[in-house]
Amino acid sequence: MESQQLSQHSHISHGSACASVTSKEVHTNQDPLDVSASKTEECEKASTKANSQQTTTPASSAVPENPHHASPQTAQSHSPQNGPYPQQCMMTQNQANPSGWSFYGHPSMIPYTPYQMSPMYFPPGPQSQFPQYPSSVGTPLSTPSPESGNTFTDSSSADSDMTSTKKYVRPPPMLTSPNDFPNWVKTYIKFLQNSNLGGIIPTVNGKPVRQITDDELTFLYNTFQIFAPSQFLPTWVKDILSVDYTDIMKILSKSIEKMQSDTQEANDIVTLANLQYNGSTPADAFETKVTNIIDRLNNNGIHINNKVACQLIMRGLSGEYKFLRYTRHRHLNMTVAELFLDIHAIYEEQQGSRNSKPNYRRNLSDEKNDSRSYTNTTKPKVIARNPQKTNNSKSKTARAHNVSTSNNSPSTDNDSISKSTTEPIQLNNKHDLHLRPGTY
């Protein structure tokens, strides 16, 4: 009876559930809702079994699933079409995993979320070469780093060995603007140094200390793509990636060159602001030094016009060059070349006066020598007077002898006395004195 009623009302049924009820089910007096409930119980058992199997998976799968992350084994790659990482240039699965590291996956599958790191970047095993990332990964660039400073150090002198007590390494922040790339690359280089990769960083001469391996190149490529999204890269970085999308080493080398150039620019500005010149060095050398600094700054985009350059040069002049500050202040359109013409004129005048001073000194010395020779020639004259005096004394003695002989008697005794008295008495002394008769 019931089956007849069901057959009568089958033409007005509007659901597949009513039409699927059979006579066997009607004879058992079983409600169709009970069948659905039984099926629901089976589904619950199946889900419970799946959950129990899921708890036996490795600890890495216990990380909360990232809704933006696609599994590297099942999901399809969707790389940006307009960025510097084109799909046709992406690494294949074998190229991205040269050593069988399944946790890397395809580079295009790497999430860009700054708040959660996928377990695929955790190296397998406790003896992994690269460190794990803490939960603070992807913090903004303005967040202070726990490491001491973010200045770049030469990788050739930096110690790239990380101690076993340092379990975590702070990753670089997310790049959020092309203008922040110079500061971001400093933190990225610091991150590589703390990750035992200081030897692959290009040195000052542009070459690394050691050769980079395939695994390290993969790690370098993936981490660079994670923390430096393509839309925030500078134009010169995009140009390098458009030629070779894996040439991260060239980007690092160019960045280091720009760091050195920035340091040179700062040094040039400080040198130009602290110029000092007093003529102690050649004017040509001073002009070459100043013009090279100005040209280097202009080539690097720091324009130094003639007015500013002349003011900086004149401020450092001293000595005889100082008056150029007052004679040249009236010339508003004075150039650096005109200022150096005046400096050269003063320098040449100084050199001319210095060359004339040694000749004057030689004349003074000649006069001194002449005076010394004159005093030496007077000594023979003084010595020549002594024989003249002796001759005069002898003449006086002779005259006295004549007078005495004319007055004496012709006796022999008197003659002997007179002869004895007329003979001069020679004294053995250094003054060569002679005593006249009658004085003793």
Curated annotation (Swiss-Prot):
Pfam families the UniProt entry points to: TYA (PF01021)
Bias type Polar residues, positions: 48-60, 71-93, 127-152, 419-428
Modified residues (Phosphoserine): S416
Biological processes per GO annotation: viral translational frameshifting
Residue ranges with Basic and acidic residues bias: 429-440
Site positions for Cleavage: H401, N402
Induction per the UniProt record: Ty1-GR1 is a highly expressed element. Induced under amino acid starvation conditions by GCN4.
Keywords: Cytoplasm, Phosphoprotein, RNA-binding, Transposable element
Cellular localization per UniProt: Cytoplasm
GO cellular component: cytoplasm
Segments of skewed composition (Low complexity): 1-16, 153-165, 402-418
Stretches for region Disordered: 1-93, 126-173, 352-440
UniProt superkingdom: Eukaryota
Annotated spans, RNA-binding: 299-401
Record text about domains: The C-terminal RNA-binding region of CA is sufficient for all its nucleocapsid-like chaperone activities.
Note in the entry: Retrotransposons are mobile genetic entities that are able to replicate via an RNA intermediate and a reverse transcription step. In contrast to retroviruses, retrotransposons are non-infectious, lack an envelope and remain intracellular. Ty1 retrotransposons belong to the copia elements (pseudoviridae).
Record function comment: Capsid protein (CA) is the structural component of the virus-like particle (VLP), forming the shell that encapsulates the retrotransposons dimeric RNA genome. The particles are assembled from trimer-clustered units and there are holes in the capsid shells that allow for the diffusion of macromolecules. CA also has nucleocapsid-like chaperone activity, promoting primer tRNA(i)-Met annealing to the multipartite primer-binding site (PBS), dimerization of Ty1 RNA and initiation of reverse transcription.
Subunit and partners: Homotrimer.
Name of protein: Transposon Ty1-GR1 Gag polyprotein
Organism expressing this protein natively: Saccharomyces cerevisiae (strain ATCC 204508 / S288c)
